[in-house]
Amino acid sequence: MKAEERDKTVKITFISNFLGPHQLPFCKAMVNRLGEDFKFVATEPMTEERIKLGWSLDKDTYPFEIKANESNELQKKAEQLAIESDVVIIGSAPDSYIIPRLKRNKLTFKYSERPLKKGIHWNNLAHIVCGMWLHHGRFQSKPIYMLAASAYTAGDYARFGCYRGKCYKWGYFPEAKKYDPDELMKGKLSAASDGLKNPCVSILWAGRLIGWKHPDASIRLAESLKKKGYSFKMTLIGTGEMEEQLHNMIGDKNLEDCVEMPGAMKASEVRSYMEKADIYLFTSDFNEGWGAVLNESMN
C-alpha cells in the first residue's frame, strides 16, 4: 500500500510477551496499513522452550518491534505508547501497561485463550475468583473488550461477569499462501508413489509434545494402520515433555520403519512438510486455543 493511502488517523500498539511466527503476519499487515503508527511491544525474551520449537524469527528485531525488557529507555517508550496510542491490544503482558490508559477511558482490547483450561475445583476456586477480579473484573466499567482466541473464552469469562457483550472472535493469523492446487498435489507422497506396487501416503503431526495435545494418539493410529497392512510414512514434528515417551512407544510397537520424529524446526520448514503431507493429524482436546498450526495445515 502506498504511503499516501495509509490510514494515519489511528495509532495502534500491540503488547505481548514476545513476537512469534503466528503474530508476525498480522503485524506486517498492520504496518502495511498504518506504517509508523503501528508498534509491537515485547515485554520479555522468547522462552527457551519456544526457541527449541523453532519459533525464532528471521530477524533479531523488526523495525516496528520494541523490546521493552532490553533497556530502561525502551521500557519508558513502551509505557508511553501504551498511554498515547488510540488503541492498545494486550496479550500475555502485565496490566501495568494498560491501567494508566484505562483511567483515561481509552479503547483497550485484551486477547486470551480460554482461562479455565484446568477447570474449576474447590482447591483453585479462590485463586481463580481473585485472578478474575484483579485482571478483568475491576476494569469492566472501562472501554475494555476481549478478543477471544478460543471457542471457550467468552463463556469462561462470562461465568465471572466479565466481557458479557464485549467479546469478539480473534486468533493467530499465520501467513496465507496462494498455491496452485494441481502443483501442490503433485508434491504429495501419494502422487510420487502412484503406480508403484505399494503406494504410500504421508501423515503429519506438528506441535508441542505435551499431554493435552495427545501426540501419543498418532502413535496408536500408526500401530493400527501398520497391523492392517497400510503403506504410510508418519512424521511427528516438535519437542516437549512427552518426547522420550513417544520414542519409547515407537520402539516398543516396532514402528521405526514408518514413524519418524525429526525434532523441532523453524515454522518455514514445518510448512514445507505440510505442503508434502497427504494427511494432517490434529489431536488436541478442548484445552487447545485457536490452533494456528491447524490454520497453516488447512492453507
In which residue ranges do the predicted regions lie?
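Conserved donor-binding/catalytic core segment of Leloir-type glycosyltransferases
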Residues: 13, 185-186, 193-213, 219-222
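Nucleotide-activated donor-binding/catalytic signature segment of Leloir-type glycosyltransferases, i.e.
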Residues: 63, 245-265
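Short His-centered aromatic/hydrophobic patch
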Residues: 89-95, 112-113
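Nucleotide-sugar donor phosphate/pyrophosphate-binding loop at the beta->alpha transition
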Residues: 116-142, 185-188
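Donor nucleotide-sugar binding/catalytic pocket of nucleotide-sugar-dependent glycosyltransferases
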Residues: 139-198
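Short alpha-helical donor nucleotide-sugar binding micro-motif in glycosyltransferases
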Residues: 264-265, 272-277
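Short alpha-helical segment that forms part of, or immediately flanks, the ligand-binding pocket
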Residues: 271, 294-299
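Acidic donor-binding loop of glycosyltransferase active sites
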Residues: 275-289
